[in-house]
Amino acid sequence: MVSPSSDNPAIAALLFSCVDAVGIIADLANFFAERGLNISRYEEYTDDGHFFSRLEWPLNDRWEDEAAFDKEFTAMAQRYQASFDVRFM
């Protein structure tokens, strides 16, 4: 992980995709809200029945690395049979 500075705070970015369904955005938002995290940037679109999103949040000490995030997030992603990728920057 890149060390944060006051000019360049550390952030994480999540790419998430699955078949479009009701409740995806709410579940993504709730996942972060329940952990006291603020989504600082969010983009989403649908194409041919598939949902795609990218979101960012400021890093804190909740997860030490991407693998720790993956372990906690996998259950949420499995609800939608989603694929996801996270990067700590």
Range-by-range predicted roles:
Residues M1-M89:
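A conserved regulatory-domain signal marking ACT and ACT-like small-molecule sensing domains
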